[in-house]
């Protein structure tokens, strides 16, 4: 399927251009493809499409319902979770059904592969590069400009950059520029949005510290097994 991957050296035109290959980017690209649109997904690293960060889980309190809503609306996250899950558990079972929340711990590498295969199998073009600016014509977005100066034209642009826009990582007292640990941030899109009159801000997400397993008294811990009869996320999972 590698014919779907290419380095842009000339102008290309798409109906929908998605910037970023995380959960939101994958869903956006696949839904647009289902609507028979010509779709391209821009990412700095094809192997990072669908990459899960520090906590490889899907769903949980409040979030599990959203995953199922995505499934009903034609999304793919629920299918990926069911296919790659290693532990399934419905939370809040001691309370009313309205607050029951499905959660799955998944194999993060298998999830990446499943997501990438789905994107490539759908005929979506993977554009390797870093989007640094929005291209506009007559007060409408008409594409993006990449770091190497290439232009990708489209009728619509969907930004799903996650934590990468001018991303910073704080570890103790140290601060460094990164979109994710070990990955470069995306610089330029934020400034492009600001130049178009959008207000920008900064959100924060936290990662809990890791413990050395040899420093833990395991006799004080309690196992939390998954459900004996796992409940899938997708209504289409048999």
What are these regions (language model features)?
Residues 1-13:
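Intrinsic disorder/low-complexity segments
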Residues 19, 146, 159-160:
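Redox-cofactor binding/interface segments in oxidoreductases and associated redox assembly factors
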């Amino acid at each position: 399927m590698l014919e779907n991957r290419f380095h842009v050296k000339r102008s290309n035109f798409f109906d929908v251009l998605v910037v970023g290959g995380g959960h939101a980017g994958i869903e956006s690209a696949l839904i647009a493809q289902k609507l028979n649109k010509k779709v391209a997904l821009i990412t700095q690293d094809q192997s990072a499409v669908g990459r899960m960060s520090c906590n490889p889980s899907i769903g949980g309190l409040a979030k599990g319902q959203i995953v199922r809503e995505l499934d009903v609306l034609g999304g793919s996250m629920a299918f990926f979770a069911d296919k790659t899950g290693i532990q399934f558990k419905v939370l809040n079972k001691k309370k009313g059904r309205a607050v029951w929340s499905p959660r799955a711990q998944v194999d993060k590498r298998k999830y990446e592969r499943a997501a990438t295969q789905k994107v490539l199998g759908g005929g979506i073009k993977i554009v390797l590069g870093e989007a640094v600016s929005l291209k506009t014509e007559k007060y409408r977005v008409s594409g993006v400009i990449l770091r190497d100066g290439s232009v990708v034209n489209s009728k619509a642009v969907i930004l799903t950059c996650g934590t990468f826009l001018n991303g910073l990582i704080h570890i103790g007292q140290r601060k460094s520029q990164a979109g994710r640990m070990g990955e470069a941030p995306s610089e330029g899109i934020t400034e492009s949005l600001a130049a178009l009159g959008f207000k920008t801000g900064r959100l924060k997400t936290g990662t809990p510290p890791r413990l050395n397993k040899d420093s833990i008294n395991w006799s004080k811990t309690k196992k939390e097994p998954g459900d004996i009869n796992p409940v899938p996320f997708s209504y289409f999972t048999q």
